[in-house]
C-alpha cells in the first residue's frame, strides 16, 4: 500500500529523482499514492499522445505554458495557459502540440 507522506517535491525534480521520456515528451512524477498520481509534462513542438482511453480513472491537465490541441471524445478542442482539461474515464482522447513552442502541463489522475 502506498500512502502519501508530507513533503515537497521540488521544481524540476521527480519522486526519487525519476524522469521519463516517452514519445518525445518529458514526464516528471510529482506525487504517487494508491489513490492519486500527478506529473509535470513538457511537450516539445510536434509531439503528441495518440488517442486512447482510460477505463478506470478520470484524467486532468492544467496548462502551465503554451497551447495543446485535443481530440476529446471525437471533438477537436484546444487549451492554453491557465486552462484545465477534463478527460473522463471511458472516453477517447488524444493530445497534440501543433504549435512552434513547447507546452508545459500538470497532469493528475
Regions inferred by a protein language model and the residue ranges of each:
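Short acidic-glycine-tyrosine-enriched beta hairpin
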Residues: 10-11, 74-92
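A short, N-terminal "cap"/entry segment at the start of jelly-roll beta-barrel domains
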Residues: 1-37
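Glycine- and acidic-residue-biased ligand/ion/polar-headgroup-sensing regions
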Residues: 56-58, 62-68, 73-74
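A generic "binding-loop/recognition-motif" signal
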Residues: 45, 56, 75, 91-92, ...
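Ligand-binding loop in jelly-roll beta-barrel domains
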Residues: 81, 89-109
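Conserved short histidine dyad/triad with adjacent acidic residue
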Residues: 22-24, 39-54
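Conserved hydrophobic/aromatic beta-strand scaffold that supports enzyme active sites
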Residues: 38-42, 60, 76, 84-86
Amino acid at each position: 500500500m502506498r500512502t502519501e507522506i508530507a513533503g515537497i517535491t521540488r521544481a524540476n525534480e521527480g519522486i526519487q529523482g525519476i524522469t521519463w521520456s516517452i514519445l518525445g515528451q518529458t514526464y516528471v512524477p510529482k506525487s504517487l499514492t494508491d489513490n492519486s498520481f500527478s506529473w509535470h509534462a513538457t511537450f516539445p513542438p510536434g509531439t503528441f499522445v495518440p488517442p486512447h482511453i482510460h477505463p478506470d480513472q478520470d484524467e486532468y491537465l492544467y496548462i502551465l505554458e503554451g497551447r495543446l490541441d485535443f481530440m476529446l471524445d471525437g471533438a477537436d478542442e484546444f487549451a492554453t495557459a491557465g486552462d484545465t482539461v477534463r478527460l473522463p474515464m471511458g472516453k477517447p482522447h488524444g493530445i497534440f502540440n501543433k504549435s512552434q513552442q513547447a507546452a508545459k502541463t500538470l497532469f493528475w489522475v
